[in-house]
Amino acid sequence: MTEPNRQSGEKEERIIEIEIERLRPFKEHPFQVKDDKEMFLLQESIEKYGILNPLIVRPVPDGYYEIISGHRRKHAAEKLGYRKVPVIIRVLSEDDSILSMVDSNLHRERISYSEKAFAYKLKNDVLKRKSGRKKSQVDHKTLRKRSIDIISEDCGDSPKQVQRYISLTKLIPEMLQKLDDEIISFCPAVEIAALKENEQRELLKAMDYAQAIPSLSQAQRIKQLSLSLIHISEPT
């Protein structure tokens, strides 16, 4: 018989096994599941020791379960031919599910810029929604502090850095991929994110044509030029 897993401050939770086919990925999951070296090592570990940490899931209609934490473990187990995986079932609201999903993934050893950017944005959106609710519906921490400050405390980045990451979600996919591939550096990418979509696409064409990447100072000048053009076009 499986021993219950006790979470601090929570009631006892049982670990049960559920068929993989009944598990669905979290619909707003910003973290990529790749067949890379880390996945290979995870498969080796599961093959040798089994799944040591159960997946966290929540029930959804039609007898299925949405994965909150454990997308990579589920993928590795599936590749190894597992039919069932150990899970802990939690009944969570949509917003609490997002917070739990983001927090459980942000502490991974390797996270891409885009994953972190969209994770921070998801968490920021939820915390801002919670701050607009009645006091009885949210904890005191959410009421006292800005959402950016809460993310900063939880994740270790400064509030300014959290804002920079969130701004990256405004990059077009092709530019964001160049950032993840470390073709563009972080700080220039933050400046480029302030450009309109059509401006980013024109810049991308220029980069490809010249086979060159803008430096921070160049990206800042491009951003300032964009802002000045906006002011010129505004009616007086």
Residue map of PLM features:
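Acidic-residue sensor for enzyme active/binding pockets
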Residues: E66, E115, E234
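Residue-level detector of conserved catalytic or cofactor/ligand-binding positions
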Residues: S228-T236
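EF-Ts-like protein-protein interaction surfaces
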Residues: S167-P173, I183-L229
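Amphipathic, non-transmembrane alpha-helical secondary structure
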Residues: F40-Q43, K121, R201, K205
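Glutamine-centric residue-chemistry signal
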Residues: Q32, I51-N53, Q137, Q200, ...
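Short, charged/polar connector segments at secondary-structure boundaries
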Residues: M1-R90, D96-R110
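Amphipathic, charge-rich alpha-helical segments that serve as recognition/docking helices
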Residues: F31-Q32, M39-F40, H75-K170, D180, ...
